[in-house]
């Protein structure tokens, strides 16, 4: 029977639900601390009878998937600075949990973290957290206050689904903002030209998905991140005005949009896979047919599925978008100095 587990290093690992249940390690009382099972610096599971306020041990790096799921007797959890990942469903169905603070050391809060927390009212996410998914979901109607940090680079448009938060946000021409973030657009209202509010730093994943009545978008200089699928399948979106300052365009951000040309700013640092994938540029003269690459200025933006065995990237290219060389997998890629 498994009696000991040793993780070398403190890097976060994803521990799946009930990963050690029934093992010798799990059944050894010496491995439990105040109703919590730790594996190295990872919080793996909790006892079903754990109650009151839980103080997670200092030095903990991650909270495992479903670690506190259905622990109906806990009323609070103190998460120490140093925890880096909170995995999917970590606090799902904690029916007596009312408030919780996520420290700034956490890099990512995964999906459905607080789903089914029927008594939850307030969540504070401290500055430093970078990514927040759809952390609520069903039975979170009592959540009326969520404090978001200025540090977010990724958030999901479904972040507040299942809560009462959206009831307290007044949309601007069908677009919902919270703090510095554009969260969501009502596809039945937004139309024509959309001017994203100045001061916005990120557009949430899938925020404008299938908003087929919009024809053009103007982005502010404050914008830094366009998250995955933000304008996915906007069938009539033919023009986007970018401003200097934007740094990251995530995968499939404008997939399926008939945009014939992109004037991308010099501030761009990364472009995700298929960020602008559509049939709008199939016959464009900006294709380097010999090497199977499509360019917008000094950015290699797309690649043909079938490429030659040797691909030479154009001299002066500053950015190669994610995944564009992954089609037929050329044997040799030459990148000029």
Each PLM stretch: what is its role?
Residues 17-19, 65-67, 87-90, 110-113, ...:
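Consensus positions within tandem repeat domains that build extended binding/scaffold surfaces
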Residues 1-14, 24-40, 47-62, 71-85, ...:
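Structural signature of tandem-repeat unit edges
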